[in-house]
Amino acid sequence: MSRVGVLVLGPAGAGKSTFCNGIISYMQSVGRRAHIVNLDPAAEASEYEFTVDIRDLISLDDVMEELSLGPNGSLVYCFEYLLENLDWLDEEIGDYNDEYLIFDCPGQIELYTHIPVLPTIVRHLQNQLNFNLCASYLLEAPFVIDTSKFFSGALSAMSAMILLELPHINVLSKVDLIKDEYSKKRLKRFLNPDPMLLVDSANADTNSKFHQLNKAIANLVDDFGMVQFLPLEAKNPDSVSTILSYIDDITQWGEAQEPKEPNDALEIEDM
C-alpha cells in the first residue's frame, strides 16, 4: 500500500506553517490521523508538535555557530547533511504506514532550483518509501495582488512544478487579509488568471522598456497553462477542507475508498 504525503512549499512568510496547522486541525476534527514532518532546520515553534523534526538531526543555529556560515550556506549544509543521513529520515517516518504526512518545507527556492536537494528527497520518498506525493505551493495574496509580483510568484510556482515533477496545486494564502479591500472580481482575476490580460495591467505600472519582458513572461505562463490558484483562509475549516479535497483527489488517499472528485472550489463570496 502506498503511503500518502503532501509537500508544503512557498516563499518565506507565505503561511506554510499556518496552513500545515490548519490541515492538522481540520483532520483531527473529522477523525483523520496526520502528522507534520518539519524539514526546516530554522523552524520556529508550531501550534502542533512536529512528529518528525529535522532539528533533531541538525539545526541551522548549530551549523552557523560551529562552522561560521551564513544563514543560506548553513541551510544548504543542513540539507546536504540530511541527504547523507537519509536512513535517519527512513527510521523516523518508517512506522507511519497508514497515516497522512505533511512535509513543512523551508522557503528558500534555491533548494530545488540551484541544488537538487528537495528533488532528491522527493525521489527517495517515492522510490524507497513508496510515498504517493502531492506538492502544494503557497503564495500570499497581499503580495501577488500586485500584477508584476504575481508574475514573479507564478514563475516560482512553475519552477517548483517542473523541477519537483510532482502533481501540484497552487494556493493563494491569506485571502482573508485582502478580501475586504479588493473587489471579488479583482481577486478572481488572480485565481484563474489570463496572463495576456494581466500583462496590460503590468505594463501600466512599469517602464516601457520592460513591456517586451512582461509580454514574454506572460506568454511563458500562458503556454504552460498550469498556473491556477485555490483561495485559502487557513482559519476557515471550509477553505482548508476544499484545499484538502484537491490534495486527496491527486493522491487518492485511502485505497479502500472509491476515487472521489474534489469539492467545488470555494468561491470568494463564500469565504
Curated annotation (Swiss-Prot):
Domain of life: Eukaryota
Stabilizes the phosphate intermediate, annotated site positions: N72
Pfam families according to UniProt: ATP_bind_1 (PF03029)
One GO-annotated biological process of the protein: protein import into nucleus
Motif Gly-Pro-Asn (GPN)-loop boundaries: 70-72
Entry keywords, A to Z: GTP-binding, Hydrolase, Nucleotide-binding
Record bears the keyword Phosphoprotein: no
Keyword Nucleotide-binding: yes
Family membership: Belongs to the GPN-loop GTPase family.
Complex formation: Heterodimers with GPN1 or GPN2. Binds to RNA polymerase II (RNAPII).
Name of protein: GPN-loop GTPase 3
Source organism of this protein record: Eremothecium gossypii (strain ATCC 10895 / CBS 109.51 / FGSC 9923 / NRRL Y-1056) (Yeast)
